């Protein structure tokens, strides 16, 4: 296959595993569940899940049933939990492939039980409690009692119960404490005891490391991919994360322009003096959005500002006369001795690292390496 375009998203599998192990070691009594939803935040779930699996990880989470089924081929004997709500008509696929599902309500469980009567085997579920996120799950104690009664069914394997902190990356613990109290109150409703109890996401995993509680699993997401959920979590200084993803390219064209010359769509940039302009083959069709205009990327060892509007397939930067065709370009991550924080790249665009990763689409090849060697 021809791979003419030099733009790549490089993924360091060693750093990924190191981050997982560091985060998992913060909570020695708990299992670290690797969140590989949304194609591992855009970095490539098949390769990442397989690498983690080969290194002993046996608990994973996806957002959809389709994602879970796709991964089962490489992590067959692992627990894979679907965090989103699936159509109850499709529970048979979860049973057939040993996939665990989120139970968001009594109605969903009742509907699922109807479909389960038509197939062999048990459905593994994790009951979702809404403790304050307001997204899915229930907080009604009477409804929880009814769910507990339905767990008597021989068609259900009550594998887990969980919730989700909505502000664990914030400065104070007030809302976390509120959610924890709601969680504990709801847990007392259940006469059936699950195998797993979990509420901590990446932020909670770091913030509440080695907390004395009854929870036995943490969900490790964005932090595994080398990003702190927030500056507040980074300031705790409990774990040193390693960058995992680097967006790189090369200069394809360099030209000199005269003072007063305009360039780009909408002629949004005008040279104040004679300048050199380098073109890089990446644009918003690749997921590098127009709001990146003005950000300073690395071209070789230089800081070069993105000038003019980001185009669909290319962008331009103002550079020195020393820049040449073929010079390395770094948008975020680590490459060729240069380093740019993805958080810095995201903050400039008024967003978060999660979105930056997820926006980089399939036209940009993912290149994986470990032991400093490309796979």
Feature names for model-found ranges:
Residues 2-12, 17, 67, 86-88, ...:
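Active-site anion/phosphate-binding pocket segments in diverse small-molecule metabolic enzymes
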């Amino acid at each position: 296959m021809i791979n003419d375009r030099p733009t790549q998203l490089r993924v360091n599998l060693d750093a990924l595993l190191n981050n997982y192990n560091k985060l998992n070691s913060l909570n020695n009594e708990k299992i670290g569940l690797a969140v590989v939803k949304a194609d591992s935040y855009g970095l490539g779930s098949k390769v990442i899940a397989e690498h983690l699996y080969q290194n002993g990880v046996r608990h994973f989470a996806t957002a959809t049933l389709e994602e879970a089924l796709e991964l089962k081929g490489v992590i067959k004997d692992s627990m894979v939990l679907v965090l989103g709500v699936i159509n109850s008509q499709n529970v048979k696929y979860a049973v057939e492939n040993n996939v665990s599902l989120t139970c968001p309500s009594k109605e969903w469980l009742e509907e699922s039980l109807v479909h389960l009567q038509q197939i062999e085997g048990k459905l593994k579920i994790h009951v979702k409690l809404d403790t304050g996120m307001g997204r899915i799950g229930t907080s009604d104690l009477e409804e929880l009692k009814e769910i507990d009664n339905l767990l008597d069914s021989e068609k259900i394997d009550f594998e887990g119960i969980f919730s989700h902190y909505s502000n664990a990356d914030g400065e104070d613990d007030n809302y976390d404490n509120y959610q924890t109290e709601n969680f504990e109150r709801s847990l007392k409703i259940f006469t059936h005891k699950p195998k797993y109890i979990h509420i901590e996401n990446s932020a909670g995993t770091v913030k509440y490391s080695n907390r004395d509680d009854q929870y036995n699993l943490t969900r490790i997401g964005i932090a595994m991919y080398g990003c702190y959920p927030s500056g507040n979590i980074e300031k705790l200084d409990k774990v040193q994360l390693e960058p995992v993803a680097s967006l790189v390219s090369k200069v394809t064209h360099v030209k000199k322009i005269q003072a007063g010359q305009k360039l780009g769509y909408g002629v949004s940039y005008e040279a104040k003096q004679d300048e050199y302009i380098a073109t890089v083959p990446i644009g918003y069709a690749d997921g590098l959005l127009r709001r990146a205009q003005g950000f300073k990327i690395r071209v070789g060892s230089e800081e070069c500002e993105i000038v003019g509007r980001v185009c669909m397939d290319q962008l331009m930067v103002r550079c020195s006369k020393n820049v040449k065709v073929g010079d390395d370009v770094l948008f975020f991550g680590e490459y060729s001795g240069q380093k740019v924080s993805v958080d810095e790249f995201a903050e400039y665009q008024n967003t978060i690292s999660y979105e930056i990763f997820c926006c980089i689409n399939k036209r940009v090849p993912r290149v994986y390496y470990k032991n400093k060697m490309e796979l």
